[in-house]
């Protein structure tokens, strides 16, 4: 099965009906046939930004627990590479969650990302390959 990275933005929008990207995120999820891949950093970001609605947080966790998205492990062994990405893109700046996704893209050879973050138009994978972005 093909894989696609998913950033926190579409996940937040999916569980927040008032978000301006809710409809686009919902349509993406309905049409998507690829395995969704994210990181614990993105999951944490989603839960933090959904903190205004406990039910949305619980629904999101249930959705993840049901296997709707695969949460890949980032270990301290990966921190050097992640730190290098944060330094490389310090002018944006790149946050830890985005750096983890770019790192996973490189590690797992995934160049597709569901995001509303325009920074993914700037981020490059090894070999200067661009990400193909969805949702935004």
PLM regions with names:
Residues 7-8, 39, 116:
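A secondary-structure boundary/capping signal
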Residues 2-4, 23-93, 103, 107-111, ...:
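PIN-domain endoribonuclease scaffold, especially VapC-family toxins
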Residues 15, 117, 124-127:
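Short, flexible helix/strand-to-coil boundary loops that buttress conserved ligand/catalytic motifs
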Residues 1-19:
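Metal-dependent nucleic-acid phosphoesterase active-site entry motif
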Residues 8, 98-99:
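Conserved glycosyltransferase catalytic-site signature
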